[in-house]
Amino acid sequence: MIFPVAEKFISINGESIRAGEPAVFIRFRGCNLRCGYCDTKWANSPDCPAEMLSTEELSSYVIGTGITNVTLTGGEPLLQEGIYELIEKLMKNGCNVEIETNGSISAAELDAMPFRPAFTFDYKLPSSGMESAMLTENYKYLRECDAVKFVSGTEADLEKAAEIISRFALTEKCKVYISPVFGGIEPKRIVEFMLERKLNGVRLQLQLHKYIWDPEKRGV
């Protein structure tokens, strides 16, 4: 299988379940959503330049780095035909695979895999313009190794995040994060909201890579 890879690089995980740890990133081209605040819009376009790499080439690259944490992102990785084969190959070779998905595509097949990766579902809040695409039935597949994150840009976003966390009892199933749209709502306000609402088990998360490097820099 051949994959359109917008970029591949080694860095630290800037967010989610392995934040701060070294990781290999594979960013695939193409996404089925168009979020208003998306910080990787360039990778969503079918015109985005991409390396066309086979399963074998990608797995050889990842394994050759010597880094065991692997983040498959995009774009939307679950749009990629052959993604299950790639995940299985990586995990059979000792990699810890995390799938960053926008939450609009069923995770049933991934959940049933003998070599199951960790999921990070990105619930799209009202300011994204894409909330109607969210497939909340995916939450029945959540395990302790998984995460749901809420990227918030407004007070309405925070209110909706609290509602979804409560409705689906997410903190009882997996890690839960609220993070600010970079340059938008202040992290301090998110902390205040979490304390006001007694959001036990919910974590504030900042995109570490945007504080270490230029927020617009790619490949980090």
Indicate residue ranges for each PLM-predicted region.
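Conserved AdoMet/S-adenosylmethionine-binding subsite of the radical SAM
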Residues: 59, 78-220
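Short aromatic/hydrophobic contact patches that present stacked aromatics
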Residues: 25, 69-71, 147-149
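Conserved Radical SAM active-site core
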Residues: 3, 7-10, 22, 34-116
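Solvent-exposed, non-transmembrane amphipathic alpha-helical segments
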Residues: 25-29, 46, 162, 168
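Amphipathic, alpha-helical segments enriched in basic
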Residues: 1-6, 10-13, 33, 37, ...
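Flexible, acidic/Gly-rich N-terminal and inter-domain linker regions that tether
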Residues: 1-29, 33-37, 41-42, 197-203, ...
